């Protein structure tokens, strides 16, 4: 209700049927929050109708029309001309007004007991009239239905839908979608002397419409001793697919100390104001430092370090008495 000092009324469209071409028959139900006896009413009609009849008289002592018995709870059926919107599927109900006239004519004799505010007023439909602050200037929302009631064999439309929820004469519509991320991690490691040692860790998590996999493989062939340990973790966020793989292979015949740390960070953000839009941000920083030291029992030794800022670390250490050939 956009007007002050007027009894609050609600209106709903209870049924719609397609007649022909752009003509539809609609039924509306109007109800007030309080009852007003019929004796106070002089005239009640629907005006400004875009249809075969521009005025639908429901009650009028001058017109001798008495189609309703309660001005605060009544139903009316009439025809309107309605046209599909730009999508070709939706038809909006044309706007109209319901005009109330209390305490007019011979009903004025009851003025001393009148207690419901303004006595003559119009209540309008629609959601296309706003003031500078965005407040609706109509009293009832707009309604719509499917074009020519397609999909219903009996020629009737699915119950007409309101344009939205109306609160303090403002129509608002909103949709919220949420998603949940579930993560699982599996870790394994092994250490062997005078043999080939392999350790791998794989962590994967899956969220709606997204898969992330990360794997680290470390292998070494030694004549003395080999120790290999690796740990990998990965995370997944909605609507992104990311894959990362790190492989390290070392063959030694001298004394080799190899230490590597690999870290991967994935960050995915979704703009709540953009439908079906995903922004992926990948950040990785790797620094490598190789130092060769002379040793009496080997031509040289090497030290390799790799560091990245993230939530996942991989560390491999190998000590052998051979030559060094690191490959990343």
Swiss-Prot record:
**PROSITE patterns for this protein:** FLO11 (PS51824)
Checking InterPro entries in the record gives:
Flo11, Keratinocyte_PR
Write down the superkingdom of origin. Answer: Eukaryota
Chain intervals for the UniProt region annotation (Disordered):
168-259, 286-328
- SS bonds (residue pairs): none
User: What region holds the Flo11 domain?
Assistant: 1-155
Q: Where is the composition biased (Low complexity)?
A: 291-328
Something else the entry says is: Open reading frame exhibits genomic organization compatible with a translational readthrough-dependent mode of expression.
* Protein name, as recorded: Bypass of stop codon protein 1
Q: Which gene encodes it?
A: BSC1
